[in-house]
Amino acid sequence: MRRDPAPGFSMLLFGVSLACYSPSLKSVQDQAYKAPVVVEGKVQGLAPAGGSSSNSTREPPASGRVALVKVLDKWPLRSGGLQREQVISVGSCAPLERNQRYIFFLEPTEQPLVFKTAFAPVDPNGKNIKKEVGKILCTDCATRPKLKKMKSQTGEVGEKQSLKCEAAAGNPQPSYRWFKDGKELNRSRDIRIKYGNGRKNSRLQFNKVRVEDAGEYVCEAENILGKDTVRGRLHVNSVSTTLSSWSGHARKCNETAKSYCVNGGVCYYIEGINQLSCKCPVGYTGDRCQQFAMVNFSKHLGFELKEAEELYQKRVLTITGICVALLVVGIVCVVAYCKTKKQRRQMHHHLRQNMCPAHQNRSLANGPSHPRLDPEEIQMADYISKNVPATDHVIRREAETTFSGSHSCSPSHHCSTATPTSSHRHESHTWSLERSESLTSDSQSGIMLSSVGTSKCNSPACVEARARRAAAYSQEERRRAAMPPYHDSIDSLRDSPHSERYVSALTTPARLSPVDFHYSLATQVPTFEITSPNSAHAVSLPPAAPISYRLAEQQPLLRHPAPPGPGPGSGPGADMQRSYDSYYYPAAGPGPRRSACALGGSLGSLPASPFRIPEDDEYETTQECAPPPPPRPRTRGASRRTSAGPRRWRRSRLNGLAAQRARAARDSLSLSSGSGCGSASASDDDADDADGALAAESTPFLGLRAAHDALRSDSPPLCPAADSRTYYSLDSHSTRASSRHSRGPPTRAKQDSGPL
């Protein structure tokens, strides 16, 4: 339902018409600040000025009509008491469209809810229109303008100069005007007025300043709240002129002659002589200012120096950056080199440790490579050479291992001193094995760790060790003088660990290979350690075990025992055996004794090794102990016939022991023999060597269990082979003693004297 126009509404038309003719400000903020009521509304309908209620729903816009406007938004400072969603009547001379939104700048009338337009309505969808209105219609937002102090400028004729006027405050934005000598300046060809920073400042710019432009300038800023002014001065320096001194009165050239002077020169006409002259700007000279005078050389030079300095700084920075980059690259290279060198040194150190002589289970010279074994799995690893003949180096029959600086004692026996002896260094090293009566045990097994050093003996400890070895050697010589002679030597066997080939393999500095002996000790027996100048040569040995020990049980197969004689206890061999047993086994008591050859053949041997590698059979291809030949008659011819045709025996894979079948054959041959081991003469031995007698195979490293089984077997002992043996006699006293013990049979060949 449409509301009827209020009474007296026709009287409003006069006021509306006046509002249409009122001047409007250029700034929207000025209009908003000037108008008493500012609202945003939507046109609901239009009515003619006569108040007729029969107008159509949609009518074209027309001036002098009354519009029904619904208030959508308002500003507190200019609300006029209106509320949102309220409908008011607005008389406007501007064309309006129904259902369109406008910002109305209104003035109240005498009638309530009836307003007239103060300024033309503005479309709120324009650029920042509503925002600009909000900036001015806020509390304490509108201020009068306040200008900053203007700086005076000084320039030369023809230069470009400008004066700047800037407002420090002012809302709405003020408008600017420039004045000189009380006259307002407008834009022209030589003068331009520019605005910047949202019309917050104004600039008066001269394209080419002239002498006439010098003077005082005034800038005025004004808004609806007030105005402010500021003053500034422009100074123009005069330049030299080419006017002749004799010239009279001069005046400026007319427009047609102004082009006579170039480069900003001012043309003058000299009356009287009717000649044109030019007033040249700074830096130019000549009749027409066509020459560059280099007047501003210092100024240009300053710019050039500044540019040169900047260029120099840039170059310095570039060179510094390159140097820093090279330094970083160098540091990275040095770090990488040091790291690589350290890794290479560690690798070489590991390789040297792997080649160190103290490394266990090192492969011996000329021997096959075996996998590394624990000390519990192997007692000794020996490698036998097939082409090296038996050497002349001998080893004493005592089984006590002697080393420098160590002593093993038992409560009831004498102490045994262990010192390594070496008499011929140019040939090879030999081991002197001595054994006291305290080292007697069937269940004892061991491995000795020995390493050969290559350093020179210069330290006091080494000199002391040499002195001890010399003293021990002289003591052993005295003890050997009182002992009966023994004909077989462990060194006579080619496969013996004390042979030249084996010892050289152990003592070669280039192929240092350790040989281990481990002794199982009782829990109550302490151990001791032998120290040497070289810490890598230290040897740890157990003391002597206080139990009984038989020498023959340690080396069961090194020598072939002789077959039994005609009867027990008869013959020179039996006497020698008794003498030997009484000397070495004083506490054995009465009972059956073993043959002398069996005991003598096993002295000085090392314990057997239970570890046998089948792949080594092709390398270690020596023969085992062959059975003795059939009984030889007393004549030399018969002995030659019986010694021919020796039979080879193949050894079995079980710890190098002979098979049971071979043992039975040897037993049958031994029973048929009519004489003992000691009945063979030197001539028979020579004949046996000429006929190719059997060469015994060295099996010195047999297991303890196999050795004990061989010793405790019921089969009679075998005689040792007579080939490739080295015999020795200790001295004249021992020779006489051996002749007394063996009256009937002749003695064997002379052996080498003294250990090597």
Curated annotation (Swiss-Prot):
Propeptide: 1-19
Ranges where the record places region Disordered: 402-439, 557-578, 608-694, 711-756
InterPro entries: EGF-like_dom, Ig-like_dom, Ig-like_dom_sf, Ig-like_fold, Ig_I-set, Ig_sub, Ig_sub2, Neuregulin
Residues bearing glycans: 55, 186, 254, 296
Top-rank lineage group of the source organism: Eukaryota
GO molecular function: ErbB-4 class receptor binding; growth factor activity; receptor ligand activity
Modified how: Proteolytic cleavage close to the plasma membrane on the external face leads to the release of the soluble growth factor form. Extensive glycosylation precedes the proteolytic cleavage.
Extracellular side: 20-315
Biased composition (Basic and acidic residues): 424-437
Residue ranges occupied by any Ig-like C2-type domain in the UniProt entry: 145-240
GO cellular component, one term: extracellular region
Residues covered by the EGF-like domain: 249-290
Annotated keywords: Cell membrane, Disulfide bond, EGF-like domain, Glycoprotein, Growth factor, Immunoglobulin domain, Membrane, Secreted, Transmembrane, Transmembrane helix
Biological processes, Gene Ontology terms: cell surface receptor signaling pathway; ERBB2-ERBB3 signaling pathway; ERBB4 signaling pathway; ERBB4-ERBB4 signaling pathway; nervous system development
Entry-linked CDD domains: EGF_CA (cd00054), Ig_Pro_neuregulin (cd05750)
PROSITE patterns membership: EGF_1, EGF_2, EGF_3, IG_LIKE
Expression across tissues: Highest expression in the brain, with lower levels in the lung. In the cerebellum, found in granule and Purkinje cells.
Record-annotated disulphide pairs: 165-219, 253-267, 261-278, 280-289
Parts of the chain that traverse the membrane: 316-336
Coiled coil segments of this chain: none
Similarity field: Belongs to the neuregulin family.
Function per UniProt: Direct ligand for ERBB3 and ERBB4 tyrosine kinase receptors. Concomitantly recruits ERBB1 and ERBB2 coreceptors, resulting in ligand-stimulated tyrosine phosphorylation and activation of the ERBB receptors. May also promote the heterodimerization with the EGF receptor.
Domain remark text: The cytoplasmic domain may be involved in the regulation of trafficking and proteolytic processing. Regulation of the proteolytic processing involves initial intracellular domain dimerization. ERBB receptor binding is elicited entirely by the EGF-like domain.
Protein name per the record: Pro-neuregulin-2, membrane-bound isoform
Species per Swiss-Prot/TrEMBL record: Mus musculus (Mouse)
